[in-house]
Amino acid sequence: MGILGWVGLIAVGVLCVRGGLSSTEYVIRSRVAREVGDILKVPCVPLPSDDLDWRYETPSAINYALIDGIFLRYHCPGLDTVLWDRHAQKAYWVNPFLFVAGFLEDLSHPAFPANTQETETRLALYKEIRQALDSRKQAASHTPVKAGCVNFDYSRTRRCVGRQDLGPTNGTSGRTPVLPPDDEAGLQPKPLTTPPPIIATSDPTPRRDAATKSRRRRPHSRRL
């Protein structure tokens, strides 16, 4: 699968949900970025506490063919990954672990090398990104998401929040937004509660009416 195909599967919103308690919702759909410096000056996204879940949402609309830059912020604790559309002047924060997994797969594709120099460069890039990902194992969990959990869920605790939408409730939180208030979405912290997980149960087998029960066929007697 090509890199754009992998990018198409990556979610670009971040939801922070503290299971069972009121918490704050952080969504990073996009940010105004007229030039590279607008991206580089954004602070790193801080790692959540151990009991805090992060979920990424798919954007409503984005043309991946128009992406002009991909930024892997090596100095950030979570390896912040940003896609930049120069024409639209927007930057999208994406799930770094899903993105890097697809990127490394593309780099290791045997059909890529065209010459010795390209092969050496590609292998060096693969090694560098692989080391960056391995050094951040504490920031991600590779445990598969159980059935009934939200798709593309990245969570250190792998808490299953079900398929219900997270609705706002009254509450406060001491955390601050992960992006400055000039984010184009104008996002403000919203208290959330985690809905109970959806547990799939099978319906009991309906009882068959006595009148519909199959009758045993009696053998016919034959006269000799």
UniProtKB/Swiss-Prot annotation:
Region (Interaction with gL): 20-161
Biased composition (Basic residues): 213-224
GO cellular component: host cell Golgi apparatus; host cell plasma membrane; membrane; viral envelope; virion membrane
Annotated stretches, region: Disordered: 161-224
The organism of origin for this protein: Human herpesvirus 1 (strain KOS)
Keywords: Disulfide bond, Fusion of virus membrane with host cell membrane, Fusion of virus membrane with host membrane, Glycoprotein, Host cell membrane, Host Golgi apparatus, Host membrane, Membrane, Signal, Viral envelope protein, Viral penetration into host cytoplasm, Virion, Virus entry into host cell
Disulphide-bridged cysteine pairs: 44-76, 149-160
Family: Belongs to the herpesviridae glycoprotein L (gL) family. Alphaherpesvirinae gL subfamily.
Protein's GO biological process: fusion of virus membrane with host plasma membrane; symbiont entry into host cell
Location of region: Interaction with gH: 20-161
Subunit structure: Interacts with glycoprotein H (gH); this interaction is necessary for the correct processing and cell surface expression of gH. The heterodimer gH/gL seems to interact with gB trimers during fusion.
Glycosylation site list: 170
Pfam families cross-referenced by the UniProt entry: GlyL_C, Herpes_UL1
Location relative to the cell: Virion membrane; Host cell membrane; Host Golgi apparatus, Host trans-Golgi network
UniProt function note: The heterodimer glycoprotein H-glycoprotein L is required for the fusion of viral and plasma membranes leading to virus entry into the host cell. Acts as a functional inhibitor of gH and maintains gH in an inhibited form. Upon binding to host integrins, gL dissociates from gH leading to activation of the viral fusion glycoproteins gB and gH.
Endpoints of the signal sequence: 1-22
Topological category with respect to the lipid bilayer: Peripheral membrane protein
HAMAP family reported in the protein's UniProt record: HSV_GL_alphagamma (MF_04034)
Domain gL alphaherpesvirus-type: 23-201
Gene: gL
Protein's UniProt name: Envelope glycoprotein L
Post-translational modification remark: N-glycosylated, O-glycosylated, and sialylated.
Primary location recorded for the protein, binned into one broad class: virion
InterPro entries for this protein: Herpes_gL_C, Herpes_gL_N, Herpes_gL_N_sf, HSV_GL_alphagamma
